[in-house]
Amino acid sequence: MVSHPIWAEIDLSAIKNNIKEIRRITNPKSQVMAVVKANAYGHGSVEVSKICLENGADRLAVARSTEALELRDAGITCPILVFGYVTEEEILKMVENDITLTVYSLEIANSIQKIAEKLGKHSKIHIKVDTGMSRLGFLPEKSSVETIKKIRELENIEVEGIYTHFADADNSDKTYTTMQFSKFTSFLHDLEENGIDIPIKHASNSAAIIDHPETHLNMVRPGIILYGLYPSELVHKERINLQPAMSLKVLVTHVKDVPENTKISYGCTFETKKQSKIASLPIGYADGFTRMLRNGNVLIHGLRVPVVGRICMDQCMIDVTSIENVNVGDVVTVFGKDGTEKISIEEFGNKLGTINYELVCMVSARVPRIYLH
């Protein structure tokens, strides 16, 4: 029995399949760091983390300190890497909870050292190298080698890992990724020439895991592929069998017959051309169903029907004139499968000119996640 008028179904067996597929195509000597930032790309970080760790992931990664603490509070004890910037106040909590931090300046390292020393603890860090993303990271040059030397000398810091991030690995042209990886491996060589051998080396994001096995090193960082979605249409999708984990569903809340020339929703931008049957749905842009999808479709009784009129904050309307026996309480699939028909995240993305990553992250926190085991 459905207890919510709107919900996101998260198929944990799909995530289990995906992590096993990632493990299958990854160098068996490489660790798998499951990326569960942004509430596991909207899927629910705690549940997803647990299923990943039970099925082949060795550790986790998040973007922010609050995300790491949520996992610790849920009883997850494995290593967790924070990719992003943390304030001095946050560093204290990270060190206390044995959470690994990303370092891309001597100043950050000194802050961690000061706090770790005060707490009488050792803090593990990973060095970030900017090989072409032009975001966070040391540039792969001689001065950076000297800085990393200084960081390694800090008594309460353990330099456990070093990594870079690819900017264009999901493209069919592999030139830029090859260049980035070459810069990274050359920098690793320069470090080793200076007596700095950092144990964990990682570069592969989802696209590189699929298309660039030479970049797997001794750890990979799957993100979007954990959730059954491909990084782009340009990667070699045939190499890995992914199953989408999220479906978004709602219940019909009202059905009415309206005459020809009835205006629907804000702005009166839609007008019926004949007598029509209109159903209301309890989903709107506050749930992640953006107003830009007003010309989209949903599924009911295994068939497509159009969204009509502007999408409201909490509701929208659909035209079910072509469907028999539509009743309050019927299930409507916003994306996912209904019988033999489906609406994919990618279809939404094409309508909006955006990517699948953004769309699953858009499903707001007020939408309950229902986990299917």
From Swiss-Prot:
<feature type="active site" description="Proton acceptor; specific for L-alanine">
    <location>
        <position position="266"/>
    </location>
</feature>
<dbReference type="InterPro" id="IPR011079">
    <property type="entry name" value="Ala_racemase_C"/>
</dbReference>
<dbReference type="GO" id="GO:0005829">
    <property type="term" value="C:cytosol"/>
</dbReference>
<dbReference type="InterPro" id="IPR020622">
    <property type="entry name" value="Ala_racemase_pyridoxalP-BS"/>
</dbReference>
<feature type="binding site">
    <location>
        <position position="135"/>
    </location>
    <ligand>
        <name>substrate</name>
    </ligand>
</feature>
<comment type="function">
    <text>Catalyzes the interconversion of L-alanine and D-alanine. This organism is able to use both L- and D-alanine as a nitrogen source. May also prevent D-alanine from interfering with the use of L-alanine.</text>
</comment>
<dbReference type="InterPro" id="IPR029066">
    <property type="entry name" value="PLP-binding_barrel"/>
</dbReference>
<feature type="modified residue" description="N6-(pyridoxal phosphate)lysine">
    <location>
        <position position="37"/>
    </location>
</feature>
<feature type="binding site">
    <location>
        <position position="313"/>
    </location>
    <ligand>
        <name>substrate</name>
    </ligand>
</feature>
<dbReference type="InterPro" id="IPR000821">
    <property type="entry name" value="Ala_racemase"/>
</dbReference>
<comment type="similarity">
    <text>Belongs to the alanine racemase family.</text>
</comment>
<feature type="active site" description="Proton acceptor; specific for D-alanine">
    <location>
        <position position="37"/>
    </location>
</feature>
<dbReference type="InterPro" id="IPR009006">
    <property type="entry name" value="Ala_racemase/Decarboxylase_C"/>
</dbReference>
<protein>
    <recommendedName>
        <fullName>Alanine racemase</fullName>
        <ecNumber>5.1.1.1</ecNumber>
    </recommendedName>
</protein>
<keyword id="KW-0663">Pyridoxal phosphate</keyword>
<dbReference type="GO" id="GO:0008784">
    <property type="term" value="F:alanine racemase activity"/>
</dbReference>
<dbReference type="GO" id="GO:0030632">
    <property type="term" value="P:D-alanine biosynthetic process"/>
</dbReference>
<comment type="pathway">
    <text>Amino-acid biosynthesis; D-alanine biosynthesis; D-alanine from L-alanine: step 1/1.</text>
</comment>
<dbReference type="GO" id="GO:0030170">
    <property type="term" value="F:pyridoxal phosphate binding"/>
</dbReference>
<dbReference type="Pfam" id="PF01168">
    <property type="entry name" value="Ala_racemase_N"/>
</dbReference>
<dbReference type="InterPro" id="IPR001608">
    <property type="entry name" value="Ala_racemase_N"/>
</dbReference>
<dbReference type="Pfam" id="PF00842">
    <property type="entry name" value="Ala_racemase_C"/>
</dbReference>
<keyword id="KW-0413">Isomerase</keyword>
